[in-house]
Amino acid sequence: MARLRVSTTVEAPPDDVWADLADISSHVEWMRDAVAIDFTSEQHQGAGTTFACATKVGPFRLTDHMEITAWSPGQAMGVRHVGLVTGDGTIRLRARRRGRTKITWSERLVFPWWMGGPVGAVVATPVLWWVWRWSMRNLRRRFA
């Protein structure tokens, strides 16, 4: 299992950050590995929303099927990966002084045997950490 956690602090209050994060279709604008998002549910926000996210890391491409499992405006968004790669993740927002917000993105991912299973997770973790760190920098720039 790959376990990842990245954080950044942005120059905006949690409600402003949430307004941006709540637009799931815009995640391709800041997530380094996200290429396209296609909703598979009629709703596009809130718990129960489902979508397919085409991802690309280097030469590797796959479609990540996800479901929003938690939706607490201004606080947290949870996701469950239900495709080839399974697991769960959470983006949490915490108010900081001077109207800033700390964003923490945590994921636990399980890779199928043909992607190396636990060994693949060990190899993928530092690569994914770098990709998600870059994504957090992109997200921070949206509030600069």
Describe these PLM feature segments.
Residues T9-P13, A54-G58, T69, R94-R96, ...:
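Solvent-exposed residues in well-ordered beta-strands and their adjoining turns
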Residues A19-A34, G48-F60, V127:
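Short, solvent-exposed helix-to-loop capping segments enriched in aromatics
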Residues D38-D88, R97-R100, W134-A144:
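Glycine-rich portal/gate segments that line the openings of hydrophobic small-molecule binding cavities
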Residues R5-S7, T63-H65, D88-T90, S106:
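Well-ordered beta-strand positions in beta-sheet-rich domains
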Residues A19-S26, R133, R137, R141:
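Short, intrinsically disordered, mixed-charge
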Residues M1-T40:
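Hydrophobic ligand-binding cavity/cleft-lining segments
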Residues R80-W134:
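Beta-strand/loop substructures that line and gate deep hydrophobic ligand-binding cavities in soluble
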